[in-house]
Amino acid sequence: MIDDASPELQFHADAARTTADVPRRAFIRKALHGYEAKRDESRAAFADWQHARHAAAAIKYEGVNRLDEYLQEFERKFTARGGEVFWASHGAQARDYILGLARERGVKSIIKSKTMTSEEIHLNDALEKEGFNVVESDLGEFIQQLKHETPYHFVFPCMHLKRDEISALFEKELGSAPSDSPEELTMIARRFLRRRYITADMGISGANFIVAETGMISITENEGNARLTTAMPKIHVALVGIEKVVPRLADLALLLPMLATAGTGQNLTCYNSMYGGPRQKGEIDGPEEFHVVLLDNHRTRLLADAEQRDALHCIRCGACLNVCPIFKNIGGHAYGTTYQGPIGSVITPHFRGLQDWKHLSGASSLCGACTEACPVKIDIHHHLLHNRRNAVAQKKDWRERLLWSGFVQLMTRPWAYRLAARLAPLAQWLHPFLQDSGFDPLAAWTKTREFPQAAAPTFGDYWRRRKGAGR
């Protein structure tokens, strides 16, 4: 990491380092190729995948465009069963509420299932600084926690790691014997985590959906860890972004299979659970307290932008990451933010500031694969263009303005264009000397790329000869 580097400089440094690791890139591509095959097979289970996308988009459109109404309906029905709701306008409020609750209840040990919102507000750091013992129970998140790294991908947190690396990590951190078996590595983590479920005083989860009609949250998973995290501790806290709301329970009949298909290439994930409040009288399991923290954290800023509001429809399936040529080459950590890939590049400037994070909008080939892959039809690649436009409109860079002004002058004056075409071979001949001098204005580009040789003859020469020949 570069000390005191801006997000953009850090991004360029991390992206350059990752792209230089060719074996790692090949490993990621192979993993994602397997995902694509499973995804296509699962899509075939739908009578009409495109119709399903339209229907899913309509559900999310209704939820987001009537957000206040549906969130209040959820709160009424959830609190009627003894649950508590806290509205957090920003990350610090959410952290303070959860920290305060843990202190008041004498909590010592906390178990967590996967929640990207907790990564977003740096909840683990805040809890650990206060002396709480925090353990991630999702296998991928647990591995990343042992490595002291953030998730690489918001569905596959440790997809960049090979078995021998995970084995070495477990040997170092957990004292286990080396193993090349995925099953044995999973059992090593399982044995460690089982004890933590039993001793945890608080369980923290996220939610895939908030159901307004029933006042419940929905969690979908493949490991069963979320069920243990939410059922065994006395206190359950769900930290959820406000955009996760959907109007009706029946909506999940479409959204859960869509999420599984787009996210992991499954028809349906293994465990799909609904949570509607603390343990009721006569029930033998479940938490004694259930708190839902509804997190804004600049989501309403994006909601106010009618042009890009549909970015809030995202169901965090990760499909856009899996097909993105940029993500496949630079990896998840290069983005420097909780939400990676194309959708992360759209929403992060809204959440964390356009000028500091505008560079992410340039981390795209604009091929449109992300938009095609999105199960809720978010127009992702056009939103990246909108972010670029808005960044320029908000604060024009004089160097970029000068560059494009010169380009316009060149392209609108035939004599200037012809002169530039004549001088291009000379400029290319001189360029290596300029590179060696350390004063190359194009160094960031030419360090890893070569310009194609200027054509000889030029297109203009060719066209004039063609006309002269009467063709």
What label would you give each PLM region?
Residues M1-E307:
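The feature marks the mature, well-folded catalytic cores of soluble enzymes
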